[in-house]
Design a protein with these regions (language model features):
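Thiolate-centered catalytic microenvironments shared by cysteine-dependent enzyme domains
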Residues: 1-89, 106-107, 122, 169-173
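Positively charged, proline/Ser/Thr-rich regional signature most characteristic
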Residues: 1-7, 85-161
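C-terminal soluble interaction/assembly domains
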Residues: 160-168, 172
Length: 173
């Protein structure tokens, strides 16, 4: 962080490909370590390029900064195995954001990727399927609040205030 000129007050902007999967994962990691001054470019790199915005291969250089990392706090944004088991036993909602074929067990990993890294296919009992890509439009931008409500409240019957665990294969979606 320091060698990249990032201080505790720096706004960090993330962007990426594949509907910002990895950008949102990096955003999540920053939240995990208490750096909440972070944003994700809606539409990612693909939309940036489609709009004719400038790109470069030049790596920027910033003056070193001081950064004091906060103590990692998983509690508010991460569920571990035992948390999930308690959640399932209590009948609370889970959302599987992997592809439909991963949810059904037909694939162990996303389509067009090596089928490795998971011990078995399928999903956690009781989980509803809402693939990550459904939260995004075809141009990679995120759907608006009404569109997301139609999916999560209308299609899978989540209610405001529900204690929900969302999961994928390794946490990048």
């Amino acid at each position: 962080m320091e060698r990249n000129g990032i201080s505790n007050d720096t706004t960090v902007i993330f962007y990426g490909d594949k509907n910002n999967w990895w950008a949102t994962y990096a955003f999540w990691v920053f939240q995990l370590f208490g750096h909440t001054n972070a944003k994700v470019i809606d539409g990612g790199r693909a939309k940036w390029i489609a709009e004719g915005r400038a790109t470069t291969r030049e790596v920027p250089k910033y003056a070193a900064s001081n950064y004091k990392a906060k103590e990692r706090n998983d509690e508010p944004i991460r569920a571990f195995r035992d948390d999930v088991l308690v959640h399932v036993k209590a009948g609370k909602p889970l959302v599987d954001v992997r592809s439909t074929k991963e949810y059904t067990g037909e694939l162990l990993h996303m389509p067009d990727y090596p089928q490795e890294g998971a011990l078995r296919g399928g999903h956690i009992p009781g989980a509803k399927s809402v693939p990550w890509a459904r939260a995004a439009n075809s141009d990679g931008t995120f759907k608006n609040a009404d569109e997301l409500k139609a999916i999560y409240e209308g299609e899978i019957s989540l209610k405001k205030g529900d204690d929900v665990i969302a999961y994928c294969r390794i946490g990048e979606r």
